Amino acid sequence: MKYPTWLRRIGGYLLAFAVGTAFGIANLPHAVAAADDLPPAPVITAQASVPLTSESFVAAAVSRSGPAVVRIDTETVVTRRTDPILDDPFFQEFFGRSFPVPPRERRIAGQGSGFIIDNSGIILTNAHVVDGASKVVVTLRDGRTFDGQVRGTDEVTDLAVVKIEPQGSALPVAPLGTSSNLQVGDWAIAVGNPVGLDNTVTLGIISTLGRSAAQAGIPDKRVEFIQTDAAINPGNSGGPLLNARGEVIGINTAIRADATGIGFAIPIDQAKAIQNTLAAGGTVPHPYIGVQMMNITVDQAQQNNRNPNSPFIIPEVDGILVMRVLPGTPAERAGIRRGDVIVAVDGTPISDGARLQRIVEQAGLNKALKLDLLRGDRRLSLTVQTAQLRNPTS
């Protein structure tokens, strides 16, 4: 079946959680002139939010948080109980179906970054750095190593807490800032251990705020990312994004694989909201209703409806098109169907799927939401009750 061009392009951009780049320093040419040949230069006084001294503000910021940035080495054991060749009919014909094969183990090494947030040994990092790891080793900048225990992970926000036991020794702690008062153009300093190069620092700015997970290319996450052009490389995942004062404002997470200078960090305020739950081994509540959706405009709906091969007729309005209703979910129980267009929530007009997701998240668990939707030429009002997200990858 041939679909319209815009409909065939539904999907996220490819995203690498660790993408690498190497950098070099170029020597700049200098022009030299005799002092007598030049007129006196005017003295210009400039104001700056960061003091201009012989010491770089970046160095000062990194000296404040850098000692608390850690390297996280992981080992994951993957066990395969059967070999694919055993399912081959010809193999089974010659050797029988009960041919004994012992389980095979494969050990996969991984590496990422993190940072210590209190002197008891609590470390924040990305869930994808430690998820499924059977062994975690944490290395500090001063060379000390500790066995790490994964206390909790949350795939929906890609956050995790790892605990080390300091055994009476003092630990450096990174000061946590806030992400609520950030501005586009603020300095952004990424610290981590890319491609095995410990204690690497890169500098950039905040490119934009509130970048949705769908725009970042990872629509299964519920994060409004900080976008930065500070280089984020393999092994940077889980490391801190600092402001000019050396305070943690985000957790470096991902970049766009189809571009350069576009990286994403989880706002630190979102991490602070769930860190205690993760440290206690708890489950972070994530309400959902169970639909896969996309934004739709009048023009897109008209283009779809003119195509005789379109899978369904779409109401010609701005709204949220339901692409799929997951089985056994609140949406299915409420009677929502594929092809419906959601146009209002609790009486408030809506046309952005990211906003609907925020409304569901903020509503909490077991809360009733009234959805106004269009189905063909009919307008319906359905009530859906939120529930705990069962499988973040669905």
From Swiss-Prot:
State the conditions that upregulate or repress this gene: Slight induction by UV-B light.
Keywords on record: Hydrolase, Periplasm, Protease, Signal
Instruction: Tell me which residues make up the PDZ domain.
Output: 293-377
Principal place where this protein is found? periplasm
Task: Give the GO molecular function terms.
Answer: identical protein binding; serine-type endopeptidase activity
Name the Pfam families on file.
PDZ_2 (PF13180), Trypsin_2 (PF13365)
Name the Gene Ontology biological process terms. Answer: proteolysis
Phenotype upon knockout? No effect in a single knockout, but growth is inhibited at high light (120 umol photons/m(2)/s) or at elevated temperature in a triple protease knockout mutant (hhoA, hhoB and htrA). Triple mutants are not phototactic. No effect on the PSII repair cycle, even in the triple protease knockout strain.
Q: Give the InterPro entries listed for this entry.
A: HhoA_HhoB_HtrA-like, PDZ, PDZ_sf, Peptidase_S1_PA, Peptidase_S1C
Stretch forming the signal peptide:
1-24
Q: What does the UniProt function comment say about this protein?
A: A putative protease, its function overlaps that of the related putative proteases HhoB and HtrA.
Provide the family line.
Answer: Belongs to the peptidase S1C family.
The identity of this protein, by name, is Putative serine protease HhoA
Whose protein is this, by species? Synechocystis sp. (strain ATCC 27184 / PCC 6803 / Kazusa)
